[in-house]
Amino acid sequence: MRHLSLLLLTSFFFWNCEAQPNRQLTPEQEKMSEATMDFETYNPPSSLVVPENPVKRAKFPFIDVHNHQFRMPEMDLSTLVAEMDELNMQVLVNLSGRGRGDEAHLRNAIKNVNGNYPNRFIVFTNISSDGIDEPGYSEKLAQQIEADVKMGANGLKIYKSLGLRWTDSKGNRIAIDDPRLDAAWAKCGELGIPVLIHAADPKQFWEPFDEDNERWLELKTRPGRKRSETNPAPFDQIIQEQHNIFKRHRNTTFINAHMGWMANDLAKLSKHLDENPNVYVEIGAIIAELGRQPRMANKFFEQYQDRVLFGKDAYNPEEYYTYFRVLETADEYFPYYKKYHAFWRMYGLNLPDEILKKLYYKNALKVIPNIDPSGFPD
């Protein structure tokens, strides 16, 4: 019986081989097998059929705590306000109050706001490393911040230039935790204004430019963003310098821009927030990281709902739609708006209303002074 079964199996095998001869490829198929396509070009539309709920207006009025309006001193704010109204943006925080460092720029920006839309804008000030080697630099820094706040500034924005590009008179890199800058952080704590600080860039900018780099396309498109251990310093070192000032100045409130480049490791970010109760984070330019891990991100927002602010960074009204869709809907598998930032698809977090309210405006009202609360529901 065993031999009979083996004979039948062998006969079936040979019959199947004869019945299914090797098919020759057609010329068209042969050509297809030799085709190549670069990564930038390959971008097929999804064939997945699922509910789509694009959102062009936030569910609740929101405060964008990370925005740059370099033309604020002379611009017609009515055009900007009309765009804000379409998005349901109640307040825009212009982090570039001094523009490229000019006190007159800050004064005229505040004058334009106060004379036209005093309840729709908040302006932050900025500092410079000019004269950092000269006696009295720290005192002058503190005096400038105090004067700017009296003028109408409600926070201090630190660009990534500190840690990446600022140098002293000898050409040495100025570290974020340089003691000569301590007066600035201390003065902000004394005045009750937050410091929104951007340190470094995504860690992938320091990694080899090869097939294993998730930011390969961005670096190819923007090669000037490539960094190294000596250009200007290791990523981890720069980030640690930032964390050092958080710990050194517990009476100062800091907003760690772009989630401190830890949105791709929310367990690490959670530990960071646990260790630094004076630190908040904002979601500018990292929504794609949250959108590809909806369950993990949902748990994070549940646990740290009082520590996260809404921020966008680059101002383009249509790009806000993606933020709203990630935060408010349960949509599946939809694209980010810049492939070179994120080539993957995202999923909606479908955050509950109470968390959305905290993210959109309640936390910012708590952290940033002098925002008019009357434009928000509760």
Roles of regions detected by a PLM:
Residues Q69-L77, S96-L106, D130-E139, W166, ...:
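Acidic-and-aromatic substrate-binding clefts and catalytic sites of carbohydrate-active enzymes
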Residues E52-R57, L80-N88, R107-F121, Q143-A153, ...:
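Acidic (Asp/Glu)-rich catalytic clusters
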Residues I63-N67, V91-L95, F121-N126, L156-I158, ...:
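Hydrophobic faces of well-ordered beta-strands that scaffold small-molecule active sites
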Residues S5-F13:
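Bacterial N-terminal signal peptides
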Residues T26-T41, K59, K203-E229, Y280, ...:
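Active-site gating loops and adjacent loop-to-helix segments of metal-dependent hydrolytic enzymes
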Residues Q29-K31, V50, H105-R225:
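Active-site gating/metal-coordination segments in enzymes
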Residues P73-E74, V81, T230, F235-N244, ...:
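H/E-rich (His + Asp/Glu) clusters that bind or coordinate divalent metals
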Residues Q20-N116:
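An N-terminally biased module of ancient metal coordination in phosphate/nucleic-acid-related enzymes
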